[in-house]
Amino acid sequence: MGSAQARQRLLAIFGQVQAYIFQVEMLKRCDPLALLPLVGSLKLNALTIRMLRRKLGGALIEQAQHQQTPLACALTMALEYAEVEGERVLRAVDDVNLAGPEGFFRATMRLDEPCEYHVRVHLDTYGGPIDAEVQFLHDAENFLKQLNYCHLITGFEAGLDALESVARFLTRTVGSGIVVPPELCDPTHPCSVCFEELCVTANQGEAVHRRLLECTCDHITRQMAVRVANIDIARHLPHALSVASERRAAAEAALRALEARRVQGHNGKSAGTEDPTQQVASRLLESHHVFKPASRCLYAVSELKFWLASTKHGDMGQPRAIDTFTENLETLDKQEKFFHLQAATVELALFGRTLDHFDRLFADQLLGLDVIDGMLVGSCAVSPDDHIEALIKACYTHHMSAPLLQRLTDPDTSNREALKQLLGRIGVDTDDGAGELGDALDVDLDNLGGAPPVNSTPCGEDALCRTVSEERPWDKLLERATADASQRRRMYAERLSKRSIASLGRCVREQRRELEKTLRVNVYGEVLLHTYVSSYNGFCARRGFCAAVSRAGTIIDNRSSTSAFDSHQFMKAALLRHPIDQSLMPSITHKFFELINGPVFDNAGHNFAQPPNTALYYSVENVGLLPHLKEELARFMITAAKGDWSISEFQRFYCFEGVTGVTATQRLAWKYIGELILAAAVFSSVFHCGEVRLLRADRTYPDSSGAQRCVSGIYITYEASCPLVAVLSAAPHGAIGAETVVIYDSDVFSLLYAVLQQLAPGSGAN
């Protein structure tokens, strides 16, 4: 079976296991008495999970010993979680007669146990032990990035032990299905992908770290838009084939009756909420027909109705933000109550009783939550997007409660006031209610359209067609000044109001992204799992390399050989007397960046490869390395090449005795690696034996049989017990065989001397 077919089968199994986990999580929240008839199926599923673990567990463990893949890792975690939680539900169902429904929920959801998401992580570095606690998803990612930065001062055994603790945390989180508990995720903490995205997008002059403060991470967890419709129960009820058709028909009839009552009440309420002024104007206009002459006032009423209607229906393409958020918290509360009423009605019709689900049994505790906690918990009747729209609606409503803002944002206000004043001038009282509108409509519209009497003003003419007198006597000066001041004050207030509304809209747009990320349903992304697998494979490759070179045909161990001192002295004297070619400094610096970078950021190995300094930049920036250390790291090789770059004593290369602290140990490791790179560069130029390939042990990979592929070269293993290994005469594709020569050493110069001897004519090495 090829790798593609194996991957397809693993994906199919993984999908079924995920579906089973989702069902188990649903059963944890259902009435336990409803699970009693399903015990046989639950046991069969639990046995199937056990069979899968027994059948696939050995192969998955064997693969994990060599190299892990995200799919295999996710399947391993999902199988472990499914077995534990599925059998937990079975045990709780068996004890439900004694513990009751509340005891069932407490057992399945671990309500009386300490938080399962607190995991202690211990890491032994060459500079001392490190203890950390992982309790959030970003804590796990931060620790993996820190371990990636400190990989060169951490042995593979210590690294794998620390990753084992992280794996336990990931099993309880990433392995628990697709939905993320809201208490695990904090979207304000950016991940490595967030940083990389900001590095390749336009920054408009802002620093990356400043932009990170406004970043909302959607990579470790991804938000999903979930919509809940009122007709979901009625839509799925006909497909409930496990109940009798008569009961199902009764439930459908009860739902239709509930919906009819709700629609009738809604229509009655809507009919009574029309503005009285609008009612009077509508009935006044309806009493007119084309055989009657239209007065000037009647035409004005019609024109105002036209403008009110046009503003309501005109701009349909781009509705205002205030008009799009039509729901509020009270409406959502009514919607949720109606949903629960529907559910209870259907349950009574189908089963003859209401079910004791988790949210009903613990309703008193849920009611004690405040508004924010209640929205985080969510509801099965209201989608998160409805809550978000209600919050934004409430924000707009509170901000626009000022009369001036209402007049500015609602241009119909002036039209409605003008319509009310006009109706008052023609003798129609809009405050008496709909019961007295009949008398108000007995208006002689013909007289309203006739000529005005002598020495009188036409009806409403001073309000609609006001003219400005040409005479401006001095006694009106104070009145005009007051009017001008009022006009300027009104224009200034409108300008401030427009600016206020623009600021509010900008704030809502900026905060909506974070609000959606917080309240929407989140599922696990692939970033955290990929980061864990990359870090695990790096330490696992170092372990596999050490095991592979131990099977070589010829092994020369100079780590404790006293006879190698002369070789050390000869090679050191030969190399130190020659200066370093400055034209090689760019390549030497890049080699330094390549060897100190961790296994997680391997941008140099991508299809569109980037230079090693880019990957190292991501590595140090993601751990928040201090600026002075970044400057020291950037100029490290240039500074080392100008001075005495040989720092290690005989057989004490990569020795950290007497050094404590991560920073001091890290700096010493940089010096050791710089010494190795400079010695190899001078060695190649002095002895003209070609380029000496400096390789990393964690960049070796196993083949299909599990054997580690190690091409010829000098490897740095980052292990204090055996830091340097030379592999010579490796078989094609890097296979270690009987013809391979392996040299162990803990001294750079004696290792180069041994390599020179092996490369001499007649040795047969290459």
UniProtKB/Swiss-Prot annotation:
HAMAP family: HSV_TRM1
Protein family according to the UniProt entry: Belongs to the herpesviridae TRM1 protein family.
Gene Ontology terms: biological process: viral DNA genome packaging
Protein name per the record: Tripartite terminase subunit 1
Binding site residues for ATP: 683-690
Organism: Equine herpesvirus 1 (strain V592)
The keyword Lyase appears for this protein: no
Pfam families: PRTP
Subcellular location: Host nucleus
ZnF start-end (C3H1-type): 191-219
Chain's role: Component of the molecular motor that translocates viral genomic DNA in empty capsid during DNA packaging. Forms a tripartite terminase complex together with TRM2 and TRM3 in the host cytoplasm. Once the complex reaches the host nucleus, it interacts with the capsid portal vertex. This portal forms a ring in which genomic DNA is translocated into the capsid. TRM1 carries an endonuclease activity that plays an important role for the cleavage of concatemeric viral DNA into unit length genomes.
Any GO CC annotation of this UniProt entry: host cell nucleus
Gene name of this polypeptide: TRM1
GO molecular function, one term: zinc ion binding
Coiled-coil segments: none
Keywords: ATP-binding, Host nucleus, Late protein, Metal-binding, Nucleotide-binding, Viral genome packaging, Viral release from host cell, Zinc, Zinc-finger
Assembly notes: Associates with TRM2 and TRM3 to form the tripartite terminase complex. Interacts with portal protein.
